[in-house]
Amino acid sequence: MTHPLIPEILDLAVPLAADLNLEVVGAVFHTHLNPPVLRVDIRNLSADTSLEDCERMSHRLETALDAADLVAGTYVLEVSSPGISRLLSSDREFVSFRGFSVIVRTREPIAGQREWVGNLVQRDEEFVYLNQKGRAISIPRHLVTQVQLNEKRS
């Protein structure tokens, strides 16, 4: 069932996307998560959708949503595209996708597991930090083989 705010959110998002030569292809509000996550999927009308497209749309939509005061309380805004590579590698991607659900794979087991799922907190020189349902997880960066956006929410 579609969240009741989605039509109003789309009314704001569609013209903003059009101004950026983008199209809104979907929106969903995951209110069962803490904090709730508003995900808006976009695509570029004239080229492959880039991380920069998502960032530009995210900034514009965040400003519009704040001004309209549609969503009460704290929430996370995710702007994404099915065409974006789901692997994170650059520092910029780790900053842009903070708060997103990720899967971290390691070359050696840590506490008996080689795959960790949680919300990305940050990456520094030594660790990748996740929030796993309120629990802080620090994974040594030298053991990390892959960090991938998670299509399924944790």
From Swiss-Prot:
Disulfide bonds: none annotated. One of its GO terms (biological process) is ribosomal small subunit assembly. It comes from the Bacteria. The keyword Cytoplasm applies. It is found in: Cytoplasm. Keywords: Cytoplasm, Ribosome biogenesis. The keyword Cytoplasm applies. Belongs to the RimP family. Required for maturation of 30S ribosomal subunits. This is Ribosome maturation factor RimP. The lineage of its organism: Bacteria, Bacillati, Cyanobacteriota, Cyanophyceae, Gomontiellales.
